[in-house]
Swiss-Prot record:
Its EC number is 6.3.4.2. CTP binds at residues 14, 147-149, 187-192, 223. The lineage of its organism: Bacteria, Pseudomonadati, Thermodesulfobacteriota, Desulfuromonadia, Geobacterales. This is CTP synthase. Pfam families: CTP_synth_N, GATase.
């Protein structure tokens, strides 16, 4: 089958839900037996989000091949069976970088390099390259229609219909139909203006996905269809759902996937959405009550920084048929106020990854609290490193143990800079990134969770466990249960005489899905649930 292209744009406001809409559509089309791939086009000039502040950009999602990408790729992977790559996310910065490199090589034979055709051709080339081998390529354009940064991307996708043929390209526009409380009615004017702006660029949307608080009445759909030049049945209501994993079911009920296959002339079987219905049923009606998990971090004022983490914990709840209630605790608050009372009543404690010294002592106090009070604990990346520091200080009595990331001259650098990172001065794209294999210790918490001895997980770090302290820590009871054998790197640590205490250097949250929860999150939530019963 010749690849079909679906371009997802957004209007009126940012954060309107394009990513979830694209991911949900991917889930619906995959349920129809189609091979789906996703791609996100970001208009900012940064080469990638790897060096951007979590407070500005939210989470950085890492792919198997080591790309630091937009958090929407996390949605795409969670909702489908896809394993995305560096090709699945590109930015204005990457496009211009590539075009300038070609110009310096002489690829343009002395021609004047312009936005049209050179920049737009580069954008189209990257879209086509990513789409190879798929039936459907869903491409989300970041930003909002009308943003000056988005114009080259919109021009490129406008050209796509002429390049590939009308029956092979579909434009889906996500827009807002606000409810005005004082007037007690929904207003279509923002949608009309958004579509008008899109049409001025030369793009006529085929489907409108209308985000609204209330169901759109038939007469309002007819009005939108008339003024926006789309079929009435192509005006799709997208109301706020009880849970984001209910969105595919809601959009299917509205007929979104039916409209897509009809307009793209695709023969596809009816979707089997039973697995999604089961997920939603477990979320809405859990059989084993609720567990309370505290996330102790430094970016808690912007929970988007921990997007995949929060979702993976929810997946652990799905696997254990229980509801997971998350509370976010700023580790600096622990430093300022002490830990007394801040973690009362929690059933599990998780310390996530992060960068910089701020808040680290608060994390160490939270880890000590979990260790000494036998509360299930999960440390990820920096969380694992601080767990080792806490153990060295309070069990091995190395009072000055720390990470050389935060104190270069510390006497006992339990965590130190990786050998291959020494001499690296550039920040962007230079960490240990992507998937690496790991061998597990038989009988460990990790091995029991995975059910195998050999695993592969995604990394994003520069610092690691210092092997000079292996013997000391092991002789004092710490288990090194996961090793990257090629580099002899410690990837997982555990405390065996504890209900469940695991720290891992990698980011397991990036591989968890609602239909296939990650083994470590499944085991962590199971331990928290058992902690309640105990």
């Amino acid at each position: 089958m010749k690849t079909k292209f679906i371009f997802v744009t957004g209007g009126v406001v940012s954060s309107i839900g394009k990513g979830l809409a694209a991911a949900s559509l991917g889930a619906l089309l995959e349920a129809r037996g189609l091979r789906v791939t996703h791609q996100k086009l970001d208009p900012y000039i940064n080469v990638d989000p790897g060096t951007m502040s979590p407070f500005q950009h939210g989470e950085v999602f890492v792919t198997d091949d080591g790309a630091e990408t937009d958090l929407d790729l996390g949605h795409y992977e969670r909702y489908t069976s896809a394993r995305l790559s560096k090709k699945s996310n590109f930015t204005t910065g990457q496009v211009y970088f590539s075009v300038i490199e070609k110009e310096r090589r002489g690829d343009y034979l002395g021609g004047t390099v312009q936005v049209i055709p050179h920049i737009t051709d580069e954008i189209k080339s990257k879209i086509l390259d990513n789409a190879k081998g798929s039936d459907i390529a869903i491409i989300e354009i970041g930003g909002t229609v009308g943003d000056i940064e988005s114009l080259p991307f919109l021009e490129a996708i406008r050209q796509f219909k002429a390049d590939r043929g009308a029956g092979n390209v579909l434009y889906l526009h996500v827009t807002l139909v606000p409810f005005i409380k004082t007037a007690d009615e929904l207003k279509t004017k923002p949608t009309q203006h958004s579509v008008k702006e899109l049409r001025e660029i030369g793009i006529q949307p085929d489907i409108l996905l209308c985000r609204c608080e209330q169901d759109l009445p038939r007469e309002m759909k007819a009005k939108i269809a008339l003024f926006c030049n789309v079929e009435e049945k192509a005006v799709i209501t997208s109301m706020d759902a009880e849970h984001i994993y209910a969105v595919p079911l809601a959009l299917h009920k509205e007929g979104l996937d039916e409209q897509v296959v009809e307009k793209l002339n695709i023969w596809a079987k009816a979707p089997d959405l039973t697995p999604w219905q089961q997920v939603v049923d477990k979320l809405m009606h859990p059989g084993h009550g609720k567990v309370r998990i505290a996330i102790v971090g430094k970016y808690v004022n912007l929970t988007e920084s921990y997007k995949s983490l929060a979702e993976a914990l929810t997946h652990g709840g799905i696997a254990n048929d229980c509801r997971v209630h998350l509370s976010y605790l700023d580790s600096e608050k622990i430093e300022q106020e002490g830990i007394d009372g801040l973690l009362d009543g929690v059933d599990g404690i998780l310390v996530p990854g992060g960068f910089g010294e701020r808040g680290t002592e608060g994390k160490i106090k939270a880890i000590e609290y979990a260790r000494t009070r036998k509360i299930p604990f999960f440390g990820i990346c920096l969380g694992m490193q601080m767990a080792v520091v806490e153990y060295a200080r309070n069990v091995c009595h190395l009072d000055d143990a720390f990470s050389s990331e935060f104190k270069q001259d510390c006497a006992n650098p339990i965590i130190h800079l990786m050998e291959e990172q020494k001499g690296v001065s550039r920040k962007g794209g230079t960490m240990r990134l992507g998937a690496y294999p790991c061998t597990l210790a038989k009988g460990s918490f990790a091995q029991k969770a995975y059910g195998t001895l050999d695993i592969s997980e995604r990394h994003r770090h520069r610092y690691e466990f210092n092997n000079d302290y292996r013997d000391l820590l092991v002789s004092n009871g710490l288990i090194l249960s996961g090793i990257y054998k090629e580099g002899d790197l410690v990837e997982i640590v555990e405390i065996p005489d504890h209900p469940w205490f695991v720290g891992c250097q990698f980011h397991p949250e990036f591989k968890s899905k609602p239909l296939n929860p990650h083994p470590l999150f499944r085991a962590f939530i199971a331990a928290a649930l058992h902690n309640i019963k105990a």
